[in-house]
């Protein structure tokens, strides 16, 4: 507005020179504004391009992470199976506890580690802790303790400190009461398995023994394992049990178990039991 008034005033005085100067100054300002506008557009375009590339890189990193996790999972499961295959089991009850250091990792990643299969000279020996629950198991072969094997170069959680890290990252939002509740779920399911104590007598008879652990306990997605802690089902499969030991089944059965199938062949029988815990 000031420039316009100055132009009118200069016109009244008849100073064409003054008018031309004013017009030149006005054109420079307009040019600066146009340049600024162009730079703004270019800058905005560059920013959008940068954000788009950044989004692409993040998505690529996410997909690579998923691919690596899937690869790690298959590697671990393969090594896990090979580590347990053909072992002479000295005990069953600590199966949870051998994996207890991994359980949070499994929960977070929703991995399926829920089957224990023993086909060679199975011998169950339960080690009980306080309140009739077990707290410990060691699996021995040739006198040495066996634990699941995995490639420490491929799996990030091979570090001994990973457990506290995962707990602090993934379980930090859980209240103390919820954490206690989650532990109780595992303890209760584990206690149900400890009812199989009497099977240790049968395992000396080359009985094949397979336990399908409760899937919703050993394989959990997010925090649903805390919120949806309803009944968890598992199953136990027994083969080659001598007919003479059939009476021992009554020591296995309790209110939380039911036989779903049973068959007899060559003086031995095969059966499947379902069990559950709350």
From Swiss-Prot:
It is found in: Cell membrane. The chain crosses the membrane at residues 30-50. The keyword Nucleotide-binding does not apply. It is a single-pass membrane protein. The keyword Transmembrane helix applies. Keywords: Cell membrane, Membrane, Transmembrane, Transmembrane helix. It comes from the Bacteria. GO terms for cellular component: plasma membrane. Involved in TCP pilus biogenesis. This is Toxin coregulated pilus biosynthesis protein D. The gene is tcpD.
């Amino acid at each position: 507005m000031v420039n316009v008034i100055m132009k009118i005033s200069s016109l009244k005085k008849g100073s064409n020179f003054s008018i031309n100067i004013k017009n030149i100054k006005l054109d420079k300002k307009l040019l600066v504004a146009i340049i600024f506008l162009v730079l703004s557009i270019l800058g905005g375009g560059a920013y959008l391009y940068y954000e788009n590339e950044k989004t692409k890189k993040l998505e690529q990193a996410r997909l690579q992470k998923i691919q690596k996790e899937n690869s790690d999972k298959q590697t671990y499961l393969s090594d896990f199976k090979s580590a347990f295959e053909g072992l002479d089991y000295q005990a069953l009850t600590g199966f949870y506890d051998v994996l207890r250091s991994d359980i949070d990792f499994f929960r977070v990643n929703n991995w399926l580690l829920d089957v224990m299969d023993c086909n060679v000279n199975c011998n169950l020996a339960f080690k009980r802790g306080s309140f009739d629950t077990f707290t410990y198991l060691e699996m021995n072969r040739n006198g040495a303790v066996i634990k699941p094997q995995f490639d420490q170069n491929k799996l990030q959680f091979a570090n001994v400190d990973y457990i506290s890290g995962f707990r602090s990252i993934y379980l930090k939002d859980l209240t103390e009461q919820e954490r206690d509740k989650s532990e109780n779920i595992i303890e209760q399911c584990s206690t149900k398995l400890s009812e199989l104590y009497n099977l240790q007598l049968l395992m000396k008879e080359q009985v094949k023994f397979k336990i399908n652990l409760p899937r919703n306990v050993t394989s959990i997605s997010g925090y649903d394992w805390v919120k949806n802690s309803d009944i968890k089902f598992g199953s136990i499969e027994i083969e080659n049990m001598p007919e003479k030991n059939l009476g021992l089944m009554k020591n296995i059965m309790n209110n939380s178990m039911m036989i779903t199938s049973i068959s007899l062949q060559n003086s031995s029988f095969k059966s499947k039991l379902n069990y559950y815990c709350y």
